[in-house]
Amino acid sequence: MPSYALLGATGATGSSVLRHLLYSGSSSDLTVNVLVRSKSKLLAAFPSLDKPRPSVTSSIPTIRIFEGDSTNPDVLCAVLQDASLVFMCVAQNGSPMGTTLVQNTAAALIEARRRQAQPRGELTVIQLRSASLNPVLAVQVPRFVHRVVCFCLAAGYADLRRACVLYEAAATEGLLQYVLVDPPTLHDARGTQTTGYRLIDTTDMKDKENQRQAICLSYADLGVAMCEIASRADELHGQGVGVTATGPVRQTWAVLAGFLLEGGLGHLDYRYGRENVVVLGVCILLLLGGLLYSIKA
């Protein structure tokens, strides 16, 4: 009987993965160990998890809920018990300077693997990353736009990079395997309707046409894509796999703009100091005001 672990099941990505595992109808013999910080929040989003499993013949997988911190190796030892694959969907909104959540979770997971009794079964980590960190996909975005996004989300991207370095070292050590999932901008966090997606092989340098990535993808389609990647993990170990939409996406740019603005201001504050940032902002406003006044005059 296969067993998965899912970290971050109450977030937009994790809940999309869990929803597909629960309702796709192809996971009857599957056990999913779900780690969340708040069990009540998970049950509010998925009330059916609080009810008895229908029957032995049900197509719904067996769900085991663990409550705790993803950076605690003791908790992860229990969550990873018998698991052959981990969906790593732990993240936080925005990109606050100094964030280390993803790399700390990676370090705790690797420590938990070291503590597991020998012989260990093989474990594959499906780590959500970003197309901005995949050279093949990032080059498709206008350079100025890419630089602005990387500046605004610098802290979150640095956290992801460090986590990936840890996974690479752990794979070399033989502790685990990993696959990196690189979506474009993600939209419609509360949506549940899928409209279609396609995986992108970023290792085939001759097939440029099929490496093209749309700029938007829904969380719902990302969840399904991550489940497909899980089913094909053996052929994708060590790769960065792109995901692109093939259908319409309900776009929520206002939410993303808020995250970019918050991250950008935080990065400016960190590099130049809040007072200097405020002075610069006032100068820009005065300059724009002067230009508008001169145009009207």
Swiss-Prot record:
It comes from the Eukaryota. Induction: The genes forming the sterigmatocystin biosynthesis cluster are co-regulated and induced on oatmeal porridge or the fungal isolates were grown either on oatmeal porridge or in YEC medium (0.2% yeast extract, 5.0% corn steep liquor). Expression is positively regulated by the cluster-specific transcription factor aflR that binds the palindromic sequence 5'-TCG(N5)CGA-3'found in the promoter. Pathway: Mycotoxin biosynthesis; sterigmatocystin biosynthesis. One of its GO terms (molecular function) is oxidoreductase activity, acting on the CH-NH group of donors, NAD or NADP as acceptor. It is a single-pass membrane protein. Its EC number is 1.-.-.-. The keyword Transmembrane applies. It is found in: Membrane. Its main location: membrane. One of its GO terms (cellular component) is membrane. One of its GO terms (biological process) is sterigmatocystin biosynthetic process. Keywords: Membrane, Oxidoreductase, Transmembrane, Transmembrane helix. Belongs to the avfA family. Averufin oxidase; part of the gene cluster that mediates the biosynthesis of sterigmatocystin (ST), a polyketide-derived furanocoumarin which is part of the most toxic and carcinogenic compounds among the known mycotoxins. The first step in the biosynthesis of sterigmatocystin is the production of hexanoate by the fatty acid synthase (FAS) units stcJ and stcK. The polyketide backbone is assembled by the non-reducing polyketide synthase stcA by condensation of the starter hexanoyl-CoA and 7 malonyl-CoA extender units followed by cyclization and release of norsolorinic acid. The chain crosses the membrane at residues 277-297. InterPro entries: NAD(P)-bd_dom (IPR016040), NAD(P)-bd_dom_sf (IPR036291), Polyketide_Oxido-like (IPR051606). It is an enzyme of class 1 (oxidoreductase). This is Averufin oxidase stcO. It comes from Emericella nidulans (strain FGSC A4 / ATCC 38163 / CBS 112.46 / NRRL 194 / M139) (Aspergillus nidulans).
